[in-house]
């Protein structure tokens, strides 16, 4: 998808780097990355999908302005899809549906699209939420586009849809206020707080109080 420099090392399960996550093939702890595209910084959060990690899911969703609902083109919505999608719809997020793995043998992207629509309707999505854009593609082969039968050369279509449909964060003036959703540690920088600035701005070297 041309998101990495030529000298960067990439691999499978880049965000699911916890040993247990790799072993079980699921996301347990939320991860966040960012990319710059057409002059806009896009922050991407990978959230757990299982109800066993509901607290983590709710904390992460409060950081987001929109969501990508990733669905397998063969399997369709999974049981855990219902849990996370319900949480996202309840707080008013409008989803972009991404039907992935259309390169799979016997995949059924059109039927899966209808299954996603029915699921959202069943979860009492608003008319605006039901009017969701849908993207088809193959993450394995590095492409996303509007038509599953016509592969593109990259994932730029997905990024363009994010810029078009996900609203920019609201800028509230005042003293800095940040909701911390997770803590990390680096041997180079020490403790790291990850979260969202809800009011004011934070600058490098600023003294802040953590409460």
Per-range role (PLM):
Residues 54, 105-110, 148-153:
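Ordered, soluble secondary-structure elements with a strong preference for glycine-centered loop motifs
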Residues 59, 84-87, 196-198, 211:
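Short, solvent-exposed amphipathic alpha-helical segments in soluble enzyme
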Residues 121-211:
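Conserved catalytic-core segments of large NTP-driven translation/proteostasis enzymes
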Residues 1-71, 75-77, 84, 111, ...:
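P-loop NTPase switch module centered on the Walker A-proximal segment
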Residues 50-51, 74-77, 101-107, 139-143, ...:
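Conserved nucleotide-binding/hydrolysis micro-motifs of P-loop NTPases
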Residues 54, 78, 113, 155-159, ...:
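Hydrophobic face of alpha-helices
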Residues 61, 66-129:
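Conserved C-terminal guanine-recognition region of P-loop GTPase G domains, centered on the G4
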């Amino acid at each position: 998808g041309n998101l990495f420099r030529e000298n960067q090392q990439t691999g499978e399960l880049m965000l699911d780097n916890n040993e247990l996550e790799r072993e079980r093939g699921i996301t347990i702890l939320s991860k966040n990355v960012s990319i710059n595209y057409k002059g806009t910084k896009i922050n991407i959060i990978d959230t757990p999908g299982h109800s066993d990690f509901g607290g983590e899911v709710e904390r992460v969703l409060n950081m987001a302005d929109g969501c990508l609902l990733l669905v397998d083109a063969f399997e369709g919505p999974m049981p855990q899809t219902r849990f996370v999608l319900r949480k996202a719809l309840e707080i008013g997020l409008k989803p972009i549906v991404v039907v992935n793995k259309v390169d799979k043998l016997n995949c059924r992207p059109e039927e899966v699209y209808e299954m996603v629509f029915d699921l959202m309707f069943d979860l009492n999505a608003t008319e605006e939420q039901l009017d969701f854009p849908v993207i088809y593609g193959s993450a394995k082969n590095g492409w996303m586009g509007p038509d599953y039968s016509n592969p593109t050369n990259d994932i730029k279509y997905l990024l363009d849809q994010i810029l078009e449909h996900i609203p920019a964060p609201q800028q509230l003036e005042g003293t800095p206020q940040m909701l911390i959703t997770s803590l990390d540690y680096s041997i180079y920088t020490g403790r790291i707080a990850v979260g969202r600035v809800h009011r004011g701005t934070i600058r490098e070297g600023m003294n802040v109080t953590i409460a």
